[in-house]
Amino acid sequence: MAPKATKAEKKIVYDGKLCQLLDEYTQILVVNADNVGSKQLQNIRQGLRGDSVVLMGKNTMMKRSVRIHAEKTGNQAFLNLIPLLIGNVGLIFTKGYLKEVSEEVAKYKVGAPACVGLVAPIDVVVPPGNTGLDPSQTSFFQVLNIPTKINKGTVEIITPVELIKKGDKVGSSEAALLAKLGIRPFSYGLVVLSVYDNGSVFKPEVLDLTEDDLLEKFAIGVSQCYFSDTSHFIPNPSAAPHVFINAYKNVLAVAVATEYSFPQADEVKEYLKDPSKFAAVAAAAAPAADSGAAPAAAAKAEKEEEPAEESDDEMGFGLFDE
């Protein structure tokens, strides 16, 4: 019989495995493993087999291995993992699509009863309806102030009742009632907390972004760049025309207010000194615009004066002539 490995030997083996995975994989899901049983974890490993590896361990061991491996390889990006190793967490190394792996992990959540002393991860609401319990069980409902009535020899809950609030500890009465009603209000499984991809770390919500979401955010970014560039006079293809027009207006305003001038400004100054000149120019432009409409109107009138062509009947070629 082979001798049992010592603690130090186990640490060496674990360190070697973690370092090997860090070298092989560039994508890692950091997952929370609270209330996940060994059988459930085994099922998850089997479901991910092929392109993903699940590694659990103590945070201190994982942090130590990551830090030493970053120093050995010179890859400081690995250090971004260390702040994520808090609480009961594990690592899923994968070469697959991160969204698909995350969805596969979520499939293995299982229902769990409300055990005494457990902190509720969600609000627990008992729905109205027939409980199937006989009237002798009404004491459970009375203790919890749940309104009931007896209907056809069984206890019926009249209205929905919020039995446990998220973050509260499950009491003995709540646990007993939920067990009698056959309600397993909680579900547990590996929950993705963070995503590590080639040194970058982001929240798992990013995996749910669609192409439409990205296009919308890109459009918002372009518009923000446009307004920023026009206000700071930074030229780019979308902002350049507006930057130059605004600059021209500013120069023109300076020329009008000072002795400095240039040909375009001289014309504006003349109009400001004698507004009647501007009126004359506007009046001259109006007939020019009307002149284009005059030939069209004449052509229309000429067309109306043309005699209508004679019909076949008027020329003696009726349809039923013999």
Curated annotation (Swiss-Prot):
Pfam families found in the cross-reference section: Ribosomal_60s, Ribosomal_L10, RL10P_insert
Listed GO CC annotations: cytosolic large ribosomal subunit
Posttranslational modification: Phosphorylated.
Keywords of this entry: Phosphoprotein, Ribonucleoprotein, Ribosomal protein
Domain of life: Eukaryota
InterPro entries with a match to the protein in the record: Ribosomal_protein_uL10, Ribosomal_uL10, Ribosomal_uL10-like_insert, Ribosomal_uL10-like_insert_sf, Ribosomal_uL10-like_sf, uL10_eukaryotes
GO biological process terms held by the UniProt record: cytoplasmic translation; ribosomal large subunit assembly
Disordered: annotated span: 294-322
Gene Ontology molecular functions: large ribosomal subunit rRNA binding; structural constituent of ribosome
Residue stretches of biased makeup (Acidic residues): 304-322
Entry's family note: Belongs to the universal ribosomal protein uL10 family.
Subunit details: P0 forms a pentameric complex by interaction with dimers of P1 and P2.
Function: Ribosomal protein P0 is the functional equivalent of E.coli protein L10.
Name listed for the protein in its UniProt record: Large ribosomal subunit protein uL10
Organism: Lupinus luteus
